[in-house]
Amino acid sequence: MTAAADSDHAARGAADGDRQALAGIADRDDRAKIDRPSPAPRSRYRRFVPLATRWTDNDAYGHLNNVVYLSLFDSAVNAELVAAGVLDIEHGEVIGLVVETGCHFFSSLAFPQPLEAGLAVARIGRTSVSYEIGIFAAGAAETAAHGRFVHVYVDRKTRRPVPLPDRLLAFVKALQ
């Protein structure tokens, strides 16, 4: 076999392998569609936070990069905690550390669109809070993306979990 024939044979083999791999992904995608959540309505959330997009939030595809959404979750939750006076990010003895986050995407958003984050609390534990966050185009009826964000509250110095302070507990209960 010539070098050109070897190269052509290898390319066909790689293409066959690619097709098989893609077929496996397609099968997984079909199963995933069954369990895929739908966009959430505004009524699912208890509080709304206005958010600004930045030029650097867009990626090469012309929409907000997926990692930006997790940053928006973090900003929205912490902005509300600070505004409510239940989190002192500079001097408070108790701080929230993110231990889990995730997101489902439904439609594209891009700079310079104004956004809103809808906030709700899904679960309150002894030392943790599970938030649900929806990202909306400003005024939209359904989420463009929604996800979860879990804080474990810890002592600032020791970084050991502590029970939720009373004021924080009252605030997050109002978001359930």
Language-model regions, residue ranges each:
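Residue-level recognition of hydrophobic positions within alpha-helical transmembrane segments
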Residues: 53-55, 70, 96-98
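Residues that form generic nucleotide/phosphate-binding pockets
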Residues: 72, 80, 84, 171-175
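Hydrophobic beta-strand-centered segment that forms part of the acyl-chain substrate-binding groove
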Residues: 80-129, 143-147
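HotDog/MaoC-like acyl-thioester-processing domains
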Residues: 2-8, 12-47, 109-111, 121-176
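Conserved N-terminal beta-strand and adjoining loop/helix that marks the start
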Residues: 66-77
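Generic structural detector for well-ordered beta-strands
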Residues: 50-54, 104, 150
